[in-house]
Regions:
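A short acidic, Gly/Pro-enriched loop at the edge of an enzyme's catalytic core
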Residues: 63-76
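Residues at the starts of beta-strands that form the adenosine-phosphate
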Residues: 8, 29-31, 166
Length: 237
């Protein structure tokens, strides 16, 4: 990223703090947030906290306005968090506000658009998630420890644009070779997605973003990566 490592970084819901601590060691100025003091326990993360050298702001609810001024950060990290929220709408809007012009968001979340997840949903009606679905045994206040809101990329694509951000790249996290045979369906996915995005081009609300959406939906990482690892940039203006 431009200016790295001389960046002001915010790691939202930092968990045990591995990312925040690594960026701090690289020379970034890093803050992190926790929703509850036991966040990292609820989400089944093991091992010691690594946030001793990082300022952690407690009790930060990502459903509410964030307590930071406009353009306060050059980089915001939202790693394996969005799927735990009832909706990503408020936090994406706030990220757009607190990012400086030219700043970046790095977001990762389970990729329900990958072909394996689509195949699983077609036959079972359930998304292929990394963690089990929230069960009846959970207290309502602990629901956020599970993947209660799998992220729909077309909606995320729109939310980012509304917040003043534009997707710059998608990267692979993990590709499972046992699912490689599903790539045989790529031509069918291409044709279906092209028809779907062209169908909306005559709609004034959708016309501006449909071609860009198609481009990202057909990226190899979108179709085969276990996680969606996305970098988006806030416009300079």
């Amino acid at each position: 990223l431009p200016g790295y490592p001389r960046l002001r970084v915010l790691d939202l819901s930092a968990g045990r703090g591995e990312i925040a601590a690594a960026l701090a060691r690289e020379g970034c100025t890093v803050r992190g947030t926790h929703f509850r003091a036991d966040d990292y326990k609820l989400t089944a993360q093991s091992g010691p906290l690594q946030t001793d050298a990082v300022a952690i702001d407690p009790d930060i609810d990502l459903m509410r306005p964030l307590p930071y001024p406009d353009a306060a950060f050059d980089l915001v990290v939202l790693c394996e968090v969005a799927e735990h929220l009832p909706t990503a709408i408020p936090v994406v809007a706030e990220i757009g506000r607190i990012l400086a012009p030219g700043g970046h968001l790095v977001l990762s979340t389970p990729n329900i658009a990958r072909l394996h997840s689509r195949w699983h949903f077609f036959f079972t009606g359930t998304h292929k998630l990394i963690r089990r679905r929230a069960g009846w045994d959970l207290a309502p206040e602990d629901l956020y420890a599970y993947h209660i809101n799998p992220i729909d990329f077309p909606l995320l694509h729109t939310l980012l644009r509304q917040a003043g951000l534009e997707v710059e790249r998608l990267d692979f996290t993990l590709f499972k070779w046992k699912h490689a045979w599903l790539l045989l369906f790529y031509p069918f996915a291409w044709i279906s997605t092209r028809i779907e995005t062209r169908r909306h081009r005559g709609n004034q609300v959708h016309a501006g973003g449909e071609e860009d959406l198609f481009r990202w939906m057909m990226r190899p990482a979108m179709l085969a990566s276990e996680q969606l690892l996305l970098t988006a940039r806030k416009g300079a203006g």
